[in-house]
Amino acid sequence: MVKMVVFDLDGTLMNSLTDLAISVNYGLKLNGLEEKPVENYKTYVGNGREMLIRRAMGDAWTDHELFEKVKADYDRHYAVHCNDHTAAYDGCAEMLEKLAEKGVKTGVLSNKPDEFVDKMLKKAFPNHKFTQAWGQKPQYKTKPEPDAL
């Protein structure tokens, strides 16, 4: 019998692409870089925040000082706006409810910085109690590395 299921967050339980794109574009624009269409971000996501920003910056990411500025501006914007357009995918709340009814524990492991994970889950799934939910922490490598598990 399955005792626990651990889900990814972005692109699995929730569609967060628009908020990610808007926040990265905010950082790009503030630093004189070209904003990218939201659609492009489908190819930028995966492997965590730093890779997301590097991919959006293109070759400009090699300027360490500029990269750190874009990242800081992104972080500041995303902290306020991470739930503006983000929503759970259809059927996820019901799936989580069915798992809970069967006694299956649920968890979330995300490459998103840890400080955003709980906030987003509480808005999207206010009636579900996750056994464990965590995001990227400095002491662990990002997924697909299994370190955080």
Model-derived segments and spans:
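Substrate-recognition "cap/lid" segment bordering the active-site pocket of phosphatases
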Residues: 84-87, 113-149
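N-terminal helical cap/lid subdomain that shapes the substrate entry/recognition surface
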Residues: 2-94, 101-102, 113-115
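Generic hydrophobic alpha-helical segments
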Residues: 92-96, 148-149
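Short active-site oxyanion
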Residues: 103-107
